[in-house]
Amino acid sequence: DYEKFKNELIRLLSFVTVFGVCFIVLMGVAGQWATRIAFGSEYEISTRNMLLLAISSIGLMYALSITQGLLAFHRQGLSATAWIFGIATFPVTISFGEDLFLRVEVALIFTVFITVLLLGVFITKSFKTQRVNKT
């Protein structure tokens, strides 16, 4: 039943949203401390860097969740298309700016944003197609 599947995917994305907000807040508050404890003070990075990495990580969770939905619809080609366009964004985006960390972090965010945007369009079309085919 595609309606049930759609509701489950929405529940998953809602969970990722709640988890993501909590994770971003946690990284903003304790990210520096956690890296200092885990890797030593020589590997400490700024709060800004932790927040940007957390944002890209949550974006990746969205992308992987929606990809699973497309795979369930047997839409591997659409999934691959979204990932290829997203990955192609990385080298273009990383070429702007001076600060290497900031360039990589922003490029990661743009990469997952483009990927999630395309995956979202493709999964929405897939749900609409299934609804039309069902009737």
What are these regions (language model features)?
Residues 39-40, 101, 128:
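Residue-level recognition of short, structured coil/turn motifs
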Residues 1, 42, 74-78:
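Conserved short cytoplasmic inter-helical helices of the MFS fold
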Residues 1-39:
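Specific pore-lining/lateral-gate transmembrane helices of multi-pass inner-membrane transport
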Residues 23-29, 33, 48-94, 101-125:
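Short runs within selected transmembrane alpha-helices of multi-pass transporters and secretion channels
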Residues 41-49:
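Juxtamembrane helix-entry segments on the extracytoplasmic side of multipass membrane proteins
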Residues 1-4, 126-135:
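Interhelical loop/hinge segments that connect adjacent transmembrane helices in multipass membrane
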Residues 38-42, 72, 97:
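Helix-boundary and loop/linker segments of multi-pass membrane transporters
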